[in-house]
UniProtKB/Swiss-Prot annotation:
This is GTPase Era. It is a peripheral membrane protein. Its main location: cytoplasm. GO terms for biological process: ribosomal small subunit assembly. It comes from the Bacteria. PANTHER family: GTPASE ERA (PTHR42698), GTPASE ERA, MITOCHONDRIAL (PTHR42698:SF1). Residues 9-177 form the Era-type G domain. It is found in: Cytoplasm; Cell membrane. Transmembrane segments: none annotated.
Amino acid sequence: MEENNQAFHSGFVAIVGRPNVGKSTFLNYVIGQKVAIMSNVPQTTRNKIQGIYTTDREQIVFIDTPGIHKSHNKLGDFMVQSAMSSLNEVDAIMFMVNADEPRGAGDNYIIERLKKITDRPVYLVINKIDLVHPDELLPIVDSYKDAMDWTEVFPISALQGNNINELVTTLSQHMPEGPKYYPDDQVTDHPERFVVSELIREKVLQLTRQEVPHSVAVVIETMKSNDEGLVNIQATIIVDRSSQKGIVIGKGGKMLKEIGSRARVDIEHLLGSRVYLELWVKVSEGWRDKQGILQSFGYKKDEY
């Protein structure tokens, strides 16, 4: 019997694009678990989430960057800096755009920076094709093809999975020979506490009004397992203003209870254990513009 001497391939892929183009949805579909939060609110992703796709032949580490946007505070500065710095660390780049929106100034801003990258493949990924008629898709594709010389163009639906296997296969073919950076069963390099905080924040974004989401952070105060396998989690939801605290708590605590109930289901799925989740809400005025507070919440500038 011949030995299988096929070389193992591994590498890093950055997913960049304007806010709310479906980067997190794509990542979660490929990995098969929820490692990046999903919301219809722009600027949902704040830290570079690494999702890990592994087969017996290759391993791709995806970096889901914060959406590149015009910044209005120090948190916004951090998010944009994080997105741009990721381009220096990877073997390939995916630029994701929406099929149901024309090319705009935000897309052009990113494209001008991608043009400077000549030593790595840059793929144009047109997401949400399930929302448009094929006849409407062609002009969108042409407008981006005219913008720069892409390695390849992939129309996809991250929500429905259309054309994603073909995209991942192509990415795999461009990964260099290398080691297996992470074990087969590891799907993210973030600690469980971080992912738990993100799952809670996702529910806040999904359930609260428009003025609240950009002003929310979640801090895990304690996370301990008892002898019976129950994981006790105490977490604080940080908001920017007293009015937002009232919205998150809701009348008679109804909103906070719903946030906790939905988050607990996802956390139990993540941990594979029963979870007791206790939530508080705290006001920290102007936290998004204070470097010290940002660092205490886990947004560390020197790590990016």
